């Protein structure tokens, strides 16, 4: 559960200032209804600029600017115990990355993306080697990331066999292997489904990887098991070539 993870990480709070992240204890809950206007942040001593509206700023970490989240009404009794995991995209002012919030929208933990491109996706808590961990996907360059309960990176890897990993799923199995999804375009005659003869089909691929070594333990291709005429999809109409005939969104074991 989220409570189990956050209990485990409490001892590592002092580590955060050294890792490019920010952490703080959540404030006491309040039943007050807040304004729907974007939060405003005051100028900070020693910081040569005033943070834009809608962006958090921290005295100890002026280099961090996660987007502020305004909660108009707290659902105190309707939500499960714990925190909210989100992965905001980079905005005009706020940074993109992985973020944990309380139910008032206060930042508990934030890890900005290390590059200027891409997005963090699919932030969640999982179990690895019997311990709670945070996992997410960084779309550029397509890396899968694991942090331990002290917010330290313990694994980072990519899809294997020359493929680029997809952001839809990263699941750690009960055997402590990684299950990931891939989309790969292969040449395909689409005349039977209303497309051109010389076109592409986007197939779904599943890989099971050894997290430590990156070795492929299992690989499954939709094109080997599901015929094109079984899809409900039609050839793409938005200027992209081919057909997205087998679209994997999640994995379950």
Where do the protein language model's features map onto the residues?
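C-terminal motif of bacterial Sec signal peptides marking the signal peptidase cleavage site
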Residues: 22-23
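Histidine-/acidic-rich catalytic cores in large beta-rich domains
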Residues: 9-12, 16-18, 27-253
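N-terminal export leaders
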Residues: 2-7
């Amino acid at each position: 559960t989220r409570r189990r993870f956050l209990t485990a990480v409490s001892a590592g709070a002092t580590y955060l200032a050294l890792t490019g992240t920010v952490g703080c204890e959540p404030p006491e809950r309040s039943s007050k209804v807040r304004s729907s206007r974007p939060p405003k942040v005051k100028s900070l001593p020693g910081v040569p600029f005033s943070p834009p509206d809608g962006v958090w700023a921290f005295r100890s970490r002026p280099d961090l600017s996660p987007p502020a989240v305004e909660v108009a009404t707290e659902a105190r009794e309707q939500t499960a115990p714990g925190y909210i995991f989100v992965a905001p995209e980079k905005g005009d002012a706020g940074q993109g990355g992985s973020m944990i919030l309380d139910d008032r929208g206060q930042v508990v933990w934030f890890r900005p993306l290390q590059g200027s491109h891409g997005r963090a996706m699919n932030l969640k808590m999982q179990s690895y080697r019997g311990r709670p961990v945070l996992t997410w996907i960084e779309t550029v360059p397509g890396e899968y990331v694991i942090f331990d309960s002290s917010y330290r990176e313990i694994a980072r890897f990519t899809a294997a066999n020359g493929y680029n990993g997809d952001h839809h799923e990263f699941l750690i199995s009960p055997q402590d292997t990684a299950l990931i999804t891939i989309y790969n375009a292969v040449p395909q005659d689409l005349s039977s489904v209303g497309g051109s003869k010389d076109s592409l089909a986007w197939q779904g691929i599943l890989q099971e990887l050894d997290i430590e070594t990156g070795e492929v333990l299992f690989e499954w291709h939709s094109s080997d098991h599901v015929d094109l005429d079984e899809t409900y999809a039609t050839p793409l109409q938005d200027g992209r070539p081919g057909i997205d005939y087998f679209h994997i969104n999640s994995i379950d074991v």
